[in-house]
Amino acid sequence: MEQALNGSQRRKKIVMLLKQSPNPLSGAALGKETGVSRQVVVQDIALLRTEGYEISATPRGY
């Protein structure tokens, strides 16, 4: 069984996934990829923004 990512690792993976995707990714899709709920992804996005990442939210995802 794959070990769960800690918060820092998970946020790094979210940034990587967003940079690699040509299309917006939903919070649910990011949650599925990182093994957490959509709400945790929303919180992680907020933390990444406070760290200086420019992450736009659209109706189709981030």
Show where each model-derived region lies.
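Extreme N-terminal segment that seeds HTH/winged-HTH DNA-binding domains in transcriptional regulators
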Residues: M1-K32
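Key DNA-contact positions within bacterial/archaeal DNA-binding proteins
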Residues: Q39
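Short, hydrophobic-biased segments on the C-terminal half of alpha helices
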Residues: I45-A46
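C-terminal flanking helix
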Residues: R49-T50
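Minor-groove-contacting beta-hairpin "wing" of winged helix-turn-helix DNA-binding domains
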Residues: E54-Y62
